[in-house]
Amino acid sequence: MNPLQLLQPLPAEVKGTKLLAHWDSGATITCIPESFLEDEQPIKQTLIKTIHGEKQQNVYYLTFKVKGRKVEAEVIASPYEYILLSPTDVPWLTQQPLQLTILVPLQEYQDRILNKTALPEEQKQQLKALFTKYDNLWQHWENQVGHRKIRPHNIATGDYPPRPQKQYPINPKAKPSIQIVIDDLLKQGVLTPQNSTMNTPVYPVPKPDGRWRMVLDYREVNKTIPLTAAQNQHSAGILATIVRQKYKTTLDLANGFWAHPITPDSYWLTAFTWQGKQYCWTRLPQGFLNSPALFTADAVDLLKEVPNVQVYVDDIYLSHDNPHEHIQQLEKVFQILLQAGYVVSLKKSEIGQRTVEFLGFNITKEGRGLTDTFKTKLLNVTPPKDLKQLQSILGLLNFARNFIPNFAELVQTLYNLIASSKGKYIEWTEDNTKQLNKVIEALNTASNLEERLPDQRLVIKVNTSPSAGYVRYYNESGKKPIMYLNYVFSKAELKFSMLEKLLTTMHKALIKAMDLAMGQEILVYSPIVSMTKIQKTPLPERKALPIRWITWMTYLEDPRIQFHYDKTLPELKHIPDVYTSSIPPLKHPSQYEGVFCTDGSAIKSPDPTKSNNAGMGIVHAIYNPEYKILNQWSIPLGHHTAQMAEIAAVEFACKKALKVPGPVLVITDSFYVAESANKELPYWKSNGFVNNKKEPLKHISKWKSIAECLSIKPDITIQHEKGHQPINTSIHTEGNALADKLATQGSYVVNCNTKKPNLDAELDQLLQGNNVKGYPKQYTYYLEDGKVKVSRPEGVKIIPPQSDRQKIVLQAHNLAHTGREATLLKIANLYWWPNMRKDVVKQLGRCKQCLITNASNKTSGPILRPDRPQKPFDKFFIDYIGPLPPSQGYLYVLVIVDGMTGFTWLYPTKAPSTSATVKSLNVLTSIAIPKVIHSDQGAAFTSSTFAEWAKERGIHLEFSTPYHPQSSGKVERKNSDIKRLLTKLLVGRPTKWYDLLPVVQLALNNTYSPVLKYTPHQLLFGIDSNTPFANQDTLDLTREEELSLLQEIRASLYQPSTPPASSRSWSPVVGQLVQERVARPASLRPRWHKPSTVLEVLNPRTVVILDHLGNNRTVSIDNLKPTSHQNGTTNDTATMDHLEQNEQSS
């Protein structure tokens, strides 16, 4: 605009009122007549300087129009009747043509697009006209930035501000490119010179064209920034749902993040230093945590009304079958983007083509494939020189992992190099180069994948080989796969049976299938003839943990999944394994300075109190070149197993090998010991010598000693050699046979120590003929074989010393954890002493295994019946039913029951979330707000959001005790009624329940209660609803008669008294020892936790205990039992069941 024209009044509009505006070159903030700001809330205060002095004034954020163009700016109140405009709020009034550093060849890009487009000639000419019409939309200069006309984003930090970071050393070659970017952004107001307490380092990244991209390392800032709830959809999900029609277009928004303004209060967080001067961003910077989500949300919202459009960050995709429609919708997109203030780069855009590149893939009408650009990158890959280059190559390959069936196996050896790397160095071999080329060749020849059709069921074909699982996904009518999935089994999974490996693969396949199913059923085809029969797999054949089996079996109950047998699938087992052995080739024994042959043996111990007696044998020999024995040892080990003897023998040999200069070979005939030492020992050493259950290894001290020897002397080789072979079977047969003989000799050596009888004072007095209390005089007492015996009518019995009696009881009881009488009979076969029954009862009451396993012989008191609320809407009971079979996208039903009347409301939801609960309750609370809401302790009801919602409305939240549905009996009974009624109405069509919810709600609310003799509708409204079998007399009553009848009905409701307690019931008291029931005990696991103390009695049926984890918990006594022998039971964990100890430690 001519500067003289700025002196003229400008037409403006505020809140629908037209008035005049004046451009003021000296104004730093726009002034609006104060009458327009009376209803606005100030966002801050600022100091305003005028010719009359300085004054603090409120600042508002207002939207208004100048010359028909929308302006959003910070404003202050003015006593005048016109607007005073600040030049910074309307820069377009004096806008000059943009002049930046590098001009892009726009005409060349437009010609390329017109030449490549598949549009007919008529639409091609229309496209050419659009290029001219929307010239302001295209990027004319590199680093050109749009200006999104929205309220500026405010970057909020957490409790602590980020720490300023030092600038990295910058490559001198990058400085010219970065300086151009900074100069261009300063001209457009994207950057502003400003000092800040924060600093983020600049990290230039080279581009393929030789220039450098300006990137800032905002990791320190991002640590303090709360992540926004709305995040971008995964690219795989977008590719599965985009519309693939004949004509396709992709548009690239240039520098989209930099188009979004941020508030001045956020500038300081974005600061960086360049050439000794600090700059701050006035727009969303790249690298900021929430930039992609904020930008994408805005772009999606802008284009939501345009059909067949998909947005992913700065990439826009649209497709149509009709060329005329495609051009029409394309112009609509151009118009929206121009009005919004974005800039489009035609360099990367493709318009009206049959095949386009989107999210790194070639998008065709049938599916997607790898682009030529990606394949060229693969061909240019060279062997890596360090760990960083290897990780970069694997990242590139991983992008296309779903295009070949055995990708994970092919790259397994390359991933192993990362684990074995030493710092940044890797051991790259010629075999690795061949394997890398094999992967690249497979990807370059990979076929296109089919698109996922949302109206068809998803088909999964699953199979496995000994080392990996294979999965293919199809549309039900499709011939090409949607994608491949390959899973290499872990070290633990390699030990599974083939059935368990197949179930592991199926589990991995179904996790991915839940995203691909898009609400449709999933058909799983596998070599398993009957999935129901695998539940009967015997426990000895199960090598996986029980928790895995529980997870696998849950899929059988999922109504969305159907399992089928496909006899053609076993052919997949013939896919060759990609396996590289890590065991070095064997050397001849003459190449070692010493050879140790080891063996361990165990026999049944001659001592009846012990089970085994072990020994080990070691032979030290040398081949020089003839076999010569240097030394040999036969060592008894006492009460140990043969496995422990094998490990001890190898440990002994390793310690002796430390004194031998040069390489040493240790031979063992135990495959377990050799495999563990060569393959498992490095992992055990790294994880602290614990197994998969996080328990210490058996014989941990021996393994630690072996690991220490191998670290001190790495040239010790431990090798397995099969034992008990004929002479001359192998070069080590003679040494193995001698070691076995020495081990057997050691196992036959028994150390026998003669013990004197240990008699206490009581038995000593008895043998001296004195009368001792509890010992009948008529029997004869004597000493024989060091033991005191008594002749009784049932035979001769041993009287053990008092110190041994507890051990005898525990030994007899622990054999099978028998009850009182069975244990007493077992002991009475050999022993007798006074009060033997009393001692047995006392010791059994202290057995932790029985305490946490046996059922309670006490019953809890009678159920407390809570008082019925005095009037409707006083108390609501709420709960979720589900998951149900999917019906119109819904899986759950929120059930709300009025406590006084039993009136029920049903709300379908997609998930049992807090937001769904609040949304449903908001509808109901528009009628009346309850005083109390009772629920279980589900996540949807215990979140802080739900608590805040209830607090705002004065609602008290009440929760039932865990694992005690009786506390929410009213809603639980309604749940069972709803499920039963839905099942009856939906026979043969379980996915149609959504349409029947109103019918179910009407039926429940008009069903008579056998106890109360009224329906919930009558209790709430006083009359029948207009339904069949309704009492027609009540429908014609006046309102006064309705209220009178309703009062009579409610007054007639009586509160049934609490039933009397049974003779076996118990009542809790403070300080009492009780045991809590395990919520969902697995097979062969304890049913009760260890004893806990009652801290507080809330009511006769609810207490607060100090649970087994040390936390205070509210529990119903239905889930408790009193501990036997309150005074004689300790609460320490020394004798606690080892299973529970493991659970606590994990």
UniProtKB/Swiss-Prot annotation:
GO biological process, one term: viral penetration into host nucleus
Residues annotated as site: Cleavage: F596, C597, N751, C752
Free-text description of this protein's post-translational modifications in UniProt: Specific enzymatic cleavages in vivo by viral protease yield mature proteins. The protease is not cleaved off from Pol. Since cleavage efficiency is not optimal for all sites, long and active p65Pro-RT, p87Pro-RT-RNaseH and even some Pr125Pol are detected in infected cells.
Ranges for region Disordered: 1114-1146
Catalysed reaction equations from the record: Endonucleolytic cleavage to 5'-phosphomonoester; DNA(n) + a 2'-deoxyribonucleoside 5'-triphosphate = DNA(n+1) + diphosphate
Binding of Mg(2+) 1, residues: D252, D314, D315
Domain Peptidase A9: 1-143
Alphabetical list of InterPro entries matching this protein: DNA/RNA_pol_sf, Integrase_cat-core, Integrase_H2C2, Peptidase_aspartic_dom_sf, Retrovirus_Pol_polyprotein, Rev_trsase/Diguanyl_cyclase, RNaseH-like_sf, RNaseH_domain
Residue stretches making up the RNase H type-1 domain: 590-748
Entry superkingdom: Viruses
Subunit structure: The protease is a homodimer, whose active site consists of two apposed aspartic acid residues.
Free-text comment on this protein's domains from its UniProt entry: The reverse transcriptase/ribonuclease H (RT) is structured in five subdomains: finger, palm, thumb, connection and RNase H. Within the palm subdomain, the 'primer grip' region is thought to be involved in the positioning of the primer terminus for accommodating the incoming nucleotide. The RNase H domain stabilizes the association of RT with primer-template.
Protein name from the UniProt record: Pro-Pol polyprotein
